[in-house]
Amino acid sequence: MPNILKRWVESDRRTLRRLSNLADKVGAYADDYAQLSDDDLKAKTPEFKQRYQDGETLDDLLPEAFAAIREGAKRVLGLYPFHVQIMGGIVLHEGNIAEMKTGEGKTLTATMPVYLNALAGKGVHVVTVNEYLSARDATEMGELYNWMGLTVGLNSAEKSPEEKREAYQADITYSTNGEIGFDYLRDNMVVYKEDMVQRPLNFAIVDEVDSILIDEARTPLIISGQSEGTSALYRRVDRFAKTLHEKDDFKIDLESKTVALTDTGIEKAEKYFNLKNLYDTDNTALTHHMDQALRANFIMLRDKDYVVQDGEVLIVDSFTGRVMDGRRYSDGLHQAIEAKEGVEIQEETKTMANITYQNLFRMYKKLSGMTGTAKTEAEEFREIYNMEVVSVPTNKPVVRVDEPDLLYPTLESKFNAVVKEIKDLHEKGQPMLIGTVAVETSEYLSQRLDEENIPHVVLNAKNHAKEADIIQNAGQRGAVTIATNMAGRGTDIKLGPGVVEIGGLAVIGTERHESRRIDNQLRGRSGRQGDPGMTQFYLSLEDDLMRRFGSDRVKSFLERMNVDGEDAVIRSRMITKQVESAQKRVEGNNYDSRKNVLQYDDVMRQQRDVMYGERNQVINQDKSLKWVLMPMIKRTVDRVVSLHTQGEQSDWDLDTLLDFGISAMVSPDKISLDDLKNKSADEIKAFFMELAEDVYAEKQKQLYDPAQMLEFEKVVLLRVVDSHWTDHIDAMDQLRQSIGLRGYGQLNPLVEYQQDGFRMFEEMISDIDYDATRLFMKSEIRQNITR
């Protein structure tokens, strides 16, 4: 182990040395560029573009381009990137992750690789976690890019397709991750090329990259249509779930957050729903609803996982503590929670297009990201995204003091200690940021502070509209801010007058999050740019994390230390280590789970690539699509004829072939049984293909304008493909829900999913061939056809 660590440290040192040397080359141009007039500096942009067109690479241009935009930033923004920021910029240009501590100027760092890569003219996307940050950065940094002669676009949800297209055509586009994903999916659902808004995905710099590529990795982006509502079934199953008792009827696995019926529970269900066998294939819809009702009633917690506002169930993001507007749990879980809470059940939806962030961002030719906390997830970034995490040194040393964790026996004794600490610090005027994991904790703490007459503001999922303003003032003397997790991320907490002298910003964590990275983010709000600061986490044996993973070992440790009583407290590095090892286990579980999602989504990705690729070929075609249609007809003819001409000729089913000819190929007067008799199977196939050629020629004659013929072909293909593809996505979703049960039969669910998914995909292709054949051959031609 020591050898491995030594190699890692050496490798990191070598990387930083190389980056520092390259940053020196950028610095070498500083004096020359400072002498240039504004016009001469601006003229560098077209000069670099021309040199790129003439064969120089972006790597060749890096030292001069970085120096030019650095000088531009000094003149336009009054900010001059430090040496370490240039190093961070190089990391981003190379398609890796720059881990830069809070307050080290990530936004300014990104200007250098953004400018350099925009010179290629293929588009650069700067991706942020919310629209507030997108708009802020597009406005502030856009001033610099515009001055240097580049165009900047801002993409947001409320923009029209025309405005979106314009934003994507710009050299640099600011957008949230969700909007890029939905635009990608919508682009692959349009029926006219002109309706597409995106260019091919070229280079993205993802701000708060850990939040987007790790915390949200499992969140699929889904475009859906209405499905048949089944609210009566949700209510009925919910009523049943509420009759069950834990241990007797069902068991909860806290680690994996799953609920399973016991034999007694299964018997109760069969009696309640009057069934012989609950797990019969005829009952899959019922068992699916039951799984969701069990999760809704016994796993999903109100005010932690979701809140109920104005008769609506709203999801709370477990990482940021924010309400996720417009998001609904899929697969009927949301409806099950609505039934549990007795609010109106909204219709279930059918998935029409979907993709995970993992697969969306892996489609970029080059991807990079920046964040204050990524090192703990370095392995995941390397394995899934092929990106290295480079910890960029701070401009000034970090002088913040991180105290060892304090551990209390109960929640009550812990919160008494937290309130006392807040009171003490408030008396000397030191500003505090108090981090909580759940909305209910922030409200409970707020109530306790009201009782003590301590003025404070609460930032949680219920009021995040003003979060940037609140967080900006959190560093003023006497400010007390309670925030769920990473509310206000991306906004700096600057210290007010006189705060440095009393110790800077104090960060108090009321619980450890299951991810070390989220704890590190909270710590990182204090001690920016060499400011003083202090962080302290308060834990209790009744905390979620301790209950799930840490408590047995810690309890025995407390017993050995003879610690008892309500007010007992332990401050020990050993406790901190225990907690971190519990967190590593959770992180390991979460990583495995994300990897698992990716393996399943990769099956869909391959299918999606095939379908979207074919679809785009059809949409972009400007001549004839005969080369697509005729092979589809041939595959259909070959399959149908082969199926009905097996064995001896006397056993062939010519009547069914005649029916096929009439229903899918031509009118009854064009074919008879005599046409099929006394022919070999190959001759029958050839006969059908002759008919197809005749019909094609006839339609061409009717539509004498080639453009109209092409439009007719596109209508046929797009209608058939889209209808079958959306059904297929939905079927794959259902397959995925049910596949886990096969794990109990000693089968590997992933392998089963891959095999069944492939078989279903092949069946869909056959169905598309058949329906396209029938629609093309049998359609009446109209002049005004629309897709």
From Swiss-Prot:
Gene Ontology CC, one term: plasma membrane
PROSITE patterns: SECA, SECA_MOTOR_DEAD
SS bond partners: none
Keywords tagged on the record: ATP-binding, Cell membrane, Cytoplasm, Membrane, Nucleotide-binding, Protein transport, Translocase, Translocation, Transport
Transmembrane spans: none
Pfam families cross-referenced by the UniProt entry: P-loop_SecA, SecA_DEAD, SecA_PP_bind, SecA_SW
A GO biological-process term: intracellular protein transmembrane transport
Binding of ATP, residues: 85, 103-107, 492
SUPFAM superfamilies: Helical scaffold and wing domains of SecA, P-loop containing nucleoside triphosphate hydrolases, Pre-protein crosslinking domain of SecA
InterPro entries found in the cross-reference section: Helicase_ATP-bd (IPR014001), Helicase_C-like (IPR001650), P-loop_NTPase (IPR027417), SecA (IPR000185), SecA_CS (IPR020937), SecA_DEAD (IPR011115), SecA_motor_DEAD (IPR014018), SecA_preprotein_X-link_dom (IPR011130)
Membrane topology, from the record: Peripheral membrane protein
Catalyzed reactions per annotation: ATP + H2O + cellular proteinSide 1 = ADP + phosphate + cellular proteinSide 2
Family under the similarity heading: Belongs to the SecA family.
Job of this protein: Part of the Sec protein translocase complex. Interacts with the SecYEG preprotein conducting channel. Has a central role in coupling the hydrolysis of ATP to the transfer of proteins into and across the cell membrane, serving as an ATP-driven molecular motor driving the stepwise translocation of polypeptide chains across the membrane.
Oligomeric and partner information: Monomer and homodimer. Part of the essential Sec protein translocation apparatus which comprises SecA, SecYEG and auxiliary proteins SecDF. Other proteins may also be involved.
PANTHER family: CHLOROPLAST PROTEIN-TRANSPORTING ATPASE, SECA INNER MEMBRANE COMPONENT OF SEC PROTEIN SECRETION SYSTEM
Family annotation (NCBIfam families): PRK09200.1, PRK12904.1, secA
Name under which the protein is recorded: Protein translocase subunit SecA
The organism of origin for this protein: Levilactobacillus brevis (strain ATCC 367 / BCRC 12310 / CIP 105137 / JCM 1170 / LMG 11437 / NCIMB 947 / NCTC 947)
Organismal lineage: Bacteria, Bacillati, Bacillota, Bacilli, Lactobacillales
